[in-house]
Curated annotation (Swiss-Prot):
The gene is glyA. It comes from Xanthomonas oryzae pv. oryzae (strain KACC10331 / KXO85). It catalyses: (6R)-5,10-methylene-5,6,7,8-tetrahydrofolate + glycine + H2O = (6S)-5,6,7,8-tetrahydrofolate + L-serine. Homodimer. Its EC number is 2.1.2.1. Catalyzes the reversible interconversion of serine and glycine with tetrahydrofolate (THF) serving as the one-carbon carrier. This reaction serves as the major source of one-carbon groups required for the biosynthesis of purines, thymidylate, methionine, and other important biomolecules. Also exhibits THF-independent aldolase activity toward beta-hydroxyamino acids, producing glycine and aldehydes, via a retro-aldol mechanism. GO terms for cellular component: cytosol. (6S)-5,6,7,8-tetrahydrofolate binds at residues 121, 125-127, 355-357. This is Serine hydroxymethyltransferase. The record marks 228 as: Plays an important role in substrate specificity.
């Protein structure tokens, strides 16, 4: 019998110390990695529940194990809620991650060797959109599109590549693109060559849910997302669709299970259900609106300080700082900002002369700081501190001054109050 009174710090002090230190880091450092956010205590309560003990291969009402009545309720809540969030008529909440959701879509609709047309990782796409290092670039013939000199998707070039290569699937979505995407234009391009349009909205799902960013649901054959990032849930994936044929839905269902996964993570699915309920609250829309306001305030401030933002600004939650031609690399900037308790990630920018391990750019995002309660004035202060560090990345006095300012700001806006 397990005791309910045993504590991790007593049983495993080494691990408990690491967890406590990470909790402290999250409170004391400002988080600007665009793909990170903080989930609520309610989400964490569900994810830490006894549902982790239950195996439930299959889907609600059609399990291969007994004793699934209550986890069926949890999964059906998640399905029903995410359909409501995105106005979808199909949803699968079992993918363990966004990458696995993407893999499921590819394997459900394509054959090895088929051609896909996706956004280049070097221009803002994602590994799973056909990068050579990823299975999507190994199993399939991946053709890549990018951005023009203004940092914008060149739809004429996408059309040209589609006409030339006749892909079976066009992939739209990004991990580092700060403007709105014309989903209707992408669908027209896909239709012109008889291809599926697959949208990966992992980064912008929360913005889409709140009506702050255009929804791809009316245009894509199938859509995937992570459930963290702007959606502010546990780490995981989903597949959704609107107007999908019964045949397409069956393909998606069967490829997730039994195709690429076995038992679903019922504790994570329960946590997803909580996050989806939160996404239906009026406060969620207000939050997403503020995410964009904060991002625009930061971008405009950095531009005023002489830093180039790829595409000239942002219409979503993120921005790419282009430092080509500057002495400081993305890697060095990330390290310097880290010393000042500002957490970012180095990122390649279009036509980057440096290696992917060094880069000439930084990706900044505002979902996490907005969860803390930051508004535009706080974001402007933060952007100025970032510029101070980038102007003098090896000046210990500057780093110390910014670190003190960040610490004071974080204390004003605790993650978990």
């Amino acid at each position: 019998m397990f005791s309910r009174d045993v504590r991790l710090e007593t049983y495993d002090p080494e691990l408990a110390k690491a967890i406590a230190a990470e909790a402290g880091r999250q409170e004391d450092h400002v988080e600007l990695i665009a793909s990170e956010n903080y989930c609520s205590q309610l989400v964490m309560e569900a994810q830490g529940s006894q549902l982790t003990n239950k195996y439930a291969e299959g889907y609600p009402g059609k399990r291969y194990y007994g004793g699934c009545a209550f986890v069926d309720i949890a999964e059906q809540l998640a399905i029903d809620r995410i359909k409501q969030v995105f106005d979808a008529d199909y949803a699968n909440v079992q993918p363990h991650s966004g990458s696995q959701a993407n893999q499921a879509v590819y394997l459900a609709l394509l054959q090895p060797g088929d051609t896909i047309l996706g956004m280049s990782l070097a221009h803002g796409g994602h590994l799973t959109h056909g990068a050579k290092a990823n299975v999507s670039g190994k199993l399939f013939n991946a053709v890549q599109y990018g951005v023009n000199e203004q940092g914008l998707i060149d739809y004429d070039e996408v059309q040209r590549l589609a006409t030339e290569h006749t892909p079976k699937m066009v992939v739209a979505g990004f991990s580092a693109y700060s403007q709105k995407i014309d989903w209707a234009r992408f669908r027209a391009i896909a239709d012109s060559v008889g291809a599926y349009l697959f949208v990966d909205m992992a980064h912008i799902a929360g913005l889409v849910a709140a009506g702050v960013y255009p929804s791809p649901m009316e245009h894509a054959h199938v859509v995937t997302s992570t459930t963290h990032k702007t959606l502010r849930g546990p780490r995981g994936g989903i597949i959704v669709a609107k107007g999908a044929s019964e045949e397409l839905q069956k393909k998606l269902q069967s490829i997730v299970f039994p195709g690429i996964q076995g038992g679903p993570l019922m504790h994570v699915i329960a946590a997803k259900a909580v996050a989806f309920k939160e996404a239906l609250e009026p406060a969620f829309k207000t939050y997403q609106q503020q995410v964009v306001k904060n991002a625009q305030a930061m971008a405009n401030t950095l531009i005023a300080r002489g830093y180039k933002i790829v595409s000239g600004g942002t219409e979503n939650h993120l921005m790419l700082v282009d430092m080509i031609g500057r002495d400081v690399s993305g890697k060095d900037a990330e390290a310097a900002l880290g010393k000042a308790h500002i957490t970012v990630n180095k990122n390649a920018v279009p036509n980057d002369p440096r290696s992917p391990f060094v880069t000439s750019g930084l990706r900044l995002g505002t979902p996490a700081i907005t969860t803390r309660g930051y508004k535009e004035p706080d974001s402007i202060d933060l952007a100025n501190w970032i510029a101070d560090v980038l102007d003098a990345p090896t000046d210990e006095a500057v780093l110390a001054k910014v670190r003190d300012a960040v610490t004071a700001q974080c204390k004003r806006y605790p993650v978990y109050g």
